[in-house]
Design a protein with these regions (language model features):
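Acidic, polar-rich N-terminal leader regions of halophilic archaeal proteins
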Residues: 1-77
Length: 77
């Protein structure tokens, strides 16, 4: 999964969001077209998000790049 951020259709760094990032993540996913990919950068692994993604038809792959940095590649199926 180690690609540059430029390789994705959209990137959202949730670490820069004050408060709960769920709404911003859902907004970013709404903008994705079929086959497009969002790179979500977070300070923790967002395990509760995975069920929501699957329910909405998205696939995901997670890579921990530092102790407090996770890259979640989310693709619209």
């Amino acid at each position: 999964m180690a690609q540059s951020a430029d390789a994705y259709d959209a990137t959202l760094d949730a670490r820069e969001i004050d408060g709960e990032p769920f709404g911003a993540i859902m907004d970013a996913l709404t903008d994705l077209q079929s086959g497009e990919t969002l790179l979500l950068i977070n300070s923790f692994e967002p395990e509760p998000l995975y069920d929501v993604l699957e329910e909405r038809g998205f696939t995901h792959e997670t890579e921990q790049v530092d102790p407090e940095e996770f890259h979640i590649e989310i693709q619209h199926a």
